[in-house]
A protein has these predicted regions:
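Extended, subdomain-level signal for the structured scaffold at the beginning of enzyme domains
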Residues: 1-102, 110-115
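A conserved active-site-flanking secondary-structure segment within enzyme catalytic domains
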Residues: 119-139
Length: 139
């Protein structure tokens, strides 16, 4: 049985829950389905990535998305800075173009919007960021 490949994209000052929650959900779902899941933490620079709580996750670098079936983008305090990183945006665009299921948690929607993958689509983000999000990304 082939493993389902899931990537969780993080950045400096990401919200730990936004990464750990989806990781746990996919791990448990795969176990119940009897189908293995391979979950990888991804970031622009490989190595430890510090969350806003100070807890670090060890990430792989951004690699071609061919093997990934789902890409989850975390949110958090560092999201606006992360949304200006062209390597991050190019990776998200490439994943969407290849047909990878791309989703975000909370304010991770900023990265998806900046990458252009939300153009013409309805989206949501954290309620405290809604006004700014709508004005920054009206498309």
């Amino acid at each position: 049985m082939m493993a389902i490949m899931i990537g969780v994209l993080v950045f400096a000052d990401f919200q730990l829950l936004d990464a750990a929650g989806p990781i746990s959900v996919f791990e448990i779902a795969a176990r119940f389905a009897g189908s293995p899941a391979s979950i990888k933490v991804l970031a622009v620079t490989p190595g430890p990535v510090r969350s806003s709580s100070g807890v670090e996750l060890v990430a792989r670098g951004l690699r071609p998305t061919g093997a990934i079936s789902t890409l989850i983008v975390a949110g958090g305090e560092g999201v606006r800075t992360a949304a200006t990183c062209e390597k991050t945006l190019a990776f998200v665009r490439a994943a969407a173009k290849r047909g990878v299921r791309v989703a975000s948690v909370c304010s991770g929607a900023y990265i998806l919007a900046e990458a252009g993958v939300l153009d013409g689509r309805r989206a949501t983000t954290h309620w405290q960021r809604t006004r700014h999000f709508v004005s920054a990304y009206p498309r």
